[in-house]
């Protein structure tokens, strides 16, 4: 098994004075998955001296933390026992490491999201930091120097304080400072007013929200799987275009997820009468009136889903599955506010977070996020993606770095289903071309 040698590990605090006090967390923050979201960025050496110099990365991180000061805080409790962010300025973890085993091309050839890759390239999460007050640092960073001169930047941001778009906002700001931009000229100033997503005084739950309700114990066949096989699959711009055309012009995310859903049902050999549910997330930022500020930093996504029988998904054209996916992702402000109001009446810290059943799929869109272009002064990443997948039945849809219009999928399925999925998916993509 490959190893890395940790060279340094320290705490980086904001480079200047920051506000004290606390940041109130919304119901969507409390309902987010507990713990961290580990991600990795692979960078090819550009031939310049000082490539990803530790001092430059550390100093720019400290300056970014001035604007994003809650990231340097800790989770705590308010007087009513509600989780909040205490803006203590205690700092974040910053480590450097070296790998004598991996060159970048080797790593890109064998990388799949898994525990081993997370353990190699992302600092270990503090045991008490998942949801407990006075837990550990909310951001963990590691710069690993490969034997070829390339670099893996691994980071894990606590999900209680940021969703994917907010994480991208932080990375974009940090990268701009590393490139030499003044810290005061952040691309978009962050907004930490989470009360913009508070429940309404007169709560109005207008919809059913099964995604936030405890589920009865499923039969053995449908049990969630903590063991999984994962894969990275890339679709070219032409393949994405052909798939969207087959889906009557559906969005890239809906078209890709529709095909993944179909192929997963086939690979899992689900009975035609079995219910299969496609879970997804909706970003509420532009769906509210007025919209959230451009720099809203927190969790602004809500869970949603749509269900069908496996027979319907498999036997219908892929465009039908895309229309189902649209039904799961097209809700507007009324639905979003209904979710927030519903969560006001439940214990948001103890919602179901154990994964999805063996018949289901959870799809997350990272399309359009600046993570794929995170340039710290030495060029954009050759690859960016999640370091782990958590459980079977998970798929991220992302822009493929450096490949205009191409899409990368990070996918996890049951180990026995993955080989058949890869075959069926490749056959379907070839047939569409």
Curated annotation (Swiss-Prot):
Tissue/organ expression: Expressed in roots.
InterPro entries for this protein: CAT-like_dom_sf, Plant_Fungal_Acyltransferase
Claim: Glycoprotein is one of the keywords in the record: no
The EC number(s) this enzyme carries: 2.3.1.-
Taxonomic superkingdom: Eukaryota
Active site: 159, 375
Alphabetical keyword list: Acyltransferase, Transferase
Listed Pfam families: Transferase
Entries under SUPFAM superfamilies matching the protein: CoA-dependent acyltransferases (SSF52777)
Family of this protein: Belongs to the plant acyltransferase family.
Function: Hydroxycinnamoyl transferase that catalyzes in vitro the transfer of an acyl from p-coumaryol-CoA to glycerol or shikimate, to produce 2-O-p-coumaroyl glyceride or coumaroyl shikimate, respectively. Quercetin, glutarate, or malate do not serve as acyl acceptors in vitro. Can use feruloyl-CoA and caffeoyl-CoA as acyl donors.
Protein name as catalogued: Hydroxycinnamoyltransferase 4
